């Protein structure tokens, strides 16, 4: 099986909440696509409830695009401790951190309907929790986000 970057990360040594450059891929045409680990919870110490994570995905998909250019995708992690961000190019981690903080501030105060929540727009439109999503955003902001360097497993 192909190597998976996140399986080489020492999850016991990172300190959430954080932003981490998880990798950069070069397309056949030479474009760069950067993947960022946007971690809200400490690995193996908790998990975001699925409805809250689904709402975070919807809100951050829009709000991150408001604060950062060339966003390709925002996707929840299977472990439910954060999300991945894919961006064209190689924005510096500090710039991604600032955009993530701004998007979390927007999420923490979001008081309108959740975007993309209808049977036509979403594959599981009933599974959302705005209040919990707002609380996760507030908690991460209160704890203070930072840039986390990749710490590889010693094998």
UniProtKB/Swiss-Prot annotation:
Its EC number is 4.4.1.21. Signal peptide: none annotated. Keywords: Autoinducer synthesis, Iron, Lyase, Metal-binding, Quorum sensing. GO terms for molecular function: iron ion binding; S-ribosylhomocysteine lyase activity. InterPro entries: LuxS_sf, Metalloenz_LuxS/M16, S-ribosylhomocysteinase. It is an enzyme of class 4 (lyase). Coiled coil: none annotated. Involved in the synthesis of autoinducer 2 (AI-2) which is secreted by bacteria and is used to communicate both the cell density and the metabolic potential of the environment. The regulation of gene expression in response to changes in cell density is called quorum sensing. Catalyzes the transformation of S-ribosylhomocysteine (RHC) to homocysteine (HC) and 4,5-dihydroxy-2,3-pentadione (DPD). This is S-ribosylhomocysteine lyase.
